[in-house]
């Protein structure tokens, strides 16, 4: 039986420098250097010194796996947040097709679209006509939208949000596919109109503008998300109204386009995880998101209620295209587009933040620091 320390005590100078690293045995070193030991990983064979490159390659995956066991919110949003994204996304897509059906398959709906299409260009104030005529340039809409979308992709790539880059790619494909509905959806002949009798929904230019705006919103960091929502929503409204002033599209085309894009974006956000989220340790509540999101959602709902009230007032004159219904139809159309855009972008802003930055202990503190590599440490002794 071996002697213990009580039988052969080791006397050390209390004033001498102590090398705590050399004093630990190999088992203690392994417990310190194992990045998953504190996270409850299963013990395995004792590792020998590995190259730094091999260690770094597997460290990210190992830490994600360990953090997922310790705190699942570090690698994926709450289930309730993902369910909200899916539910609101489906509701917006359903609303898009509901508006299209009401405005295309009913007499009052076609009359409403026809009044706005025919009378809006000549009933705008002078300053608004100038702005709309500038925006209603196809090359300008494409150029500005591409710049906004490119800024979003660059922001995601610079932040190394690779899962988010993949989500953006899927969203772009879905938005492009939605424009193919224009050649598929029917438009029955119900009333005689001066506008083209073929289906024109959804609006391709509005889809492009809205898609670029939502890409920017979901890709930028927390500090500028609220600003991105305001800028993107404003650009979407300008493009949507401009294509109506230029008589390229009807009111229902624009509303359908905005709701489709935001609805598809919310469904894509339901699959957010890992690098599609903010880094752990940087997840905090955002005052700007709370204020701007609340204003957009509340303001959007109020504007939509006002638009619905005005439509109800002019409804008796729609089927005869009465002159007294013209002004109300125009006001309700523009106000409705602004309200729907504000509500959609406000919801998207709020849901993007709760999927990107779910609050938890590790989300606030951050992941444990990476320990030094044994081989590299021994080489520096």
Region roles according to the model:
Residues 2-144, 182-193, 325-381:
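N-terminal transmembrane-helix/juxtamembrane module of multi-pass inner/ER membrane proteins
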Residues 68-83, 151-166, 187-188, 214-228, ...:
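Cytoplasmic membrane-interface segments at the C-terminal ends of transmembrane helices
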Residues 166, 170-174, 178, 257, ...:
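Alpha-helical transmembrane segments in multi-pass membrane proteins
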């Amino acid at each position: 039986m071996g002697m213990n320390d009580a039988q052969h005590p080791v006397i050390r100078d209390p004033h001498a420098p102590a090398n705590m690293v050399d004093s630990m045995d190999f088992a203690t070193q392994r417990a310190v250097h194992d990045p998953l030991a504190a996270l409850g990983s299963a013990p395995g064979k004792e590792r020998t010194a590995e190259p730094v490159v091999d260690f770094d390659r597997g460290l990210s995956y190992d830490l994600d796996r360990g953090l997922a066991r310790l705190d699942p919110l570090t690698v994926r949003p709450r289930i309730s947040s993902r369910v909200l994204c899916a539910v609101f996304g489906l509701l917006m897509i359903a609303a898009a097709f509901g508006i299209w059906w009401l405005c295309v398959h009913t007499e009052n709906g076609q009359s409403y679209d026809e009044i706005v299409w025919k009378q809006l260009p000549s009933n705008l104030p002078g300053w608004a006509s100038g702005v709309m005529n500038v925006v209603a340039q196809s090359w300008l809409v494409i150029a500005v939208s591409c710049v906004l979308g490119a800024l979003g992709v660059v922001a995601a790539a610079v932040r190394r949000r690779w899962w988010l880059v993949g989500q953006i790619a899927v969203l772009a494909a879905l938005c492009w596919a939605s424009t193919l509905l224009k050649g598929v959806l029917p438009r029955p002949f119900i009333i005689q109109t001066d506008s083209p009798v073929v289906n024109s929904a959804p609006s391709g230019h509005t889809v492009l503008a809205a898609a670029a705006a939502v890409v920017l919103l979901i890709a930028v960091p927390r500090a500028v998300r609220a600003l991105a929502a305001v800028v993107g929503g404003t650009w979407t409204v300008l493009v949507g109204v401009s294509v109506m002033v230029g008589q390229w599209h009807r009111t229902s085309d624009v509303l359908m386009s905005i709701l489709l894009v935001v609805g598809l974006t919310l469904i894509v956000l339901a699959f957010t995880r890992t690098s599609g989220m903010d880094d752990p340790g940087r997840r905090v509540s955002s005052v700007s998101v709370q204020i701007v999101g609340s204003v957009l959602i509340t303001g959007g709902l109020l504007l939509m209620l006002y638009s619905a009230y005005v439509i109800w007032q002019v409804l008796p004159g729609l089927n005869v295209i009465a002159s007294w219904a013209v002004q109300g139809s125009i006001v309700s159309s523009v106000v409705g587009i602004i309200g729907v855009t504000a509500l959609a972008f406000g919801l998207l802003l709020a849901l993007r933040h709760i999927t990107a930055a779910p609050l938890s202990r590790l989300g606030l503190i951050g992941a444990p620091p990476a320990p030094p590599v044994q081989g590299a440490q021994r080489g520096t002794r």
